Amino acid sequence: MSTDSIEVAIIGAGITGITLALGLLSRGIPVRVYERARDFHEIGAGIGFTPNAEWAMKVVDPRIQAAFKRVATPNASDWFQWVDGFNESGTDPRETEEQLLFKIYLGERGFEGCHRADFLGELARLLPEGVVTFQKALDTVEPAADNSLGQLLRFQDGTTATAHAVIGCDGIRSRVRQILLGEDHPAASAHYSHKYAARGLIPMDRAREALGEDKVATRFMHLGPDAHALTFPVSHGSLLNVVAFVTDPNPWPYADRWTAQGPKEDVTAAFSRFGPTMRTIIDLLPDPIDQWAVFDTYDHPPNTYSRGAVCIAGDAAHAAAPHHGAGAGCGVEDAAVLCAVLDMAAKRVDTAKDGTEGKAALITTAFETYDAVRRERAQWLVESSRVIGNLYEWQDKEVGSDASRCHDEVYWRSHRIWDYDIDAMMRETAEVFEARVAGVAKN
């Protein structure tokens, strides 16, 4: 490993990890990505990106936003519609309408969806060969015996690697988070939010035949008591993505996994009193069905995203319930800031005092800057996502099923995400970094 540059190890080859790797490589910063899976793999489900996330993609590397647009499916309308999935009369969804509760303008081609695997595949094709090493499950991170090598990474297969900086993009069940905070720390693990999601992709021909064109061509949020669902087209309109959420008062039954495939009967029961549109959507989902426990960092948020030369990003730092549809985009914002701080640190390495010690101090300052800029907003997203999930299921004691009050809450919370000024975030990042470097130099 060269000691003339900052070499970075990224743990996790999901969307956040690969986005970050592409951004660092485009800035000339050497990167290795270590992924525990056998290959690039994302769940067979849809994902959406809000306008702020697309802006952040451009900041990281314009090729990333172009890759997303290649696989994104435009909505038939630029308005996101929230409908009453519960109080719908009639029996045939092709002849009935869910009551429109409210709608919010997304902007031109805003909040488009795609298939996760399609997007990750596009990103992977942008990576140079050899950047990602698969079947590498991280065990520990510790300072290397030779200070010039930075951090020593040990993997569960007995192999090792070194890097000056380590970034955990290893998702909700992050090993890097455990290492950074301590395995016994309450925030070392995410916690069950007492909702799970039944996820599935319905061939569009079947969905269109059963529901009618208007109900499958754009993005809908179907609200109701103790359950709700999001539907939108993906894969260039060939599939209807369905995410049906169910409140679950019980503990998640599987200690070793947060996903399970089981009979559809519990999901069917949760939506049994809903209107014909939602009942038909659930009927169209496969049986058995994939169920995903919604874990997040709401109960015990990390009190820092960094320590020394180690930091966490994306779901590893701020796992959020998906009710805002903004978790992955928040990870892209993280990547934009991390690219900036490491780029600024790398440009100072040649003039850093004390050689290796100066490099280590710059990395620490870079990661502390990232923590200072990102943690408040990211944790707000975690908290707001919980609020939104309760609003959609009429569980908020003050709002209940009041559509006007629900709209007001959803509107300001959504726009706080969508309208975030990424350029201002980048200016703040540079200012905080320079101020911290100056403070270190004085000491």
Swiss-Prot record:
It is an enzyme of class 1 (oxidoreductase). FAD binds at E35, G48, R116, D315, A328. Signal peptide: none annotated. SUPFAM superfamilies: FAD-linked reductases, C-terminal domain, FAD/NAD(P)-binding domain. Its cofactor is FAD. Glycans are attached at N75, N87. Its main location: membrane. Pfam families: FAD_binding_3. GO terms for biological process: secondary metabolite biosynthetic process. Keywords: FAD, Flavoprotein, Glycoprotein, Membrane, Monooxygenase, Oxidoreductase, Transmembrane, Transmembrane helix. This is FAD-dependent monooxygenase orf3.
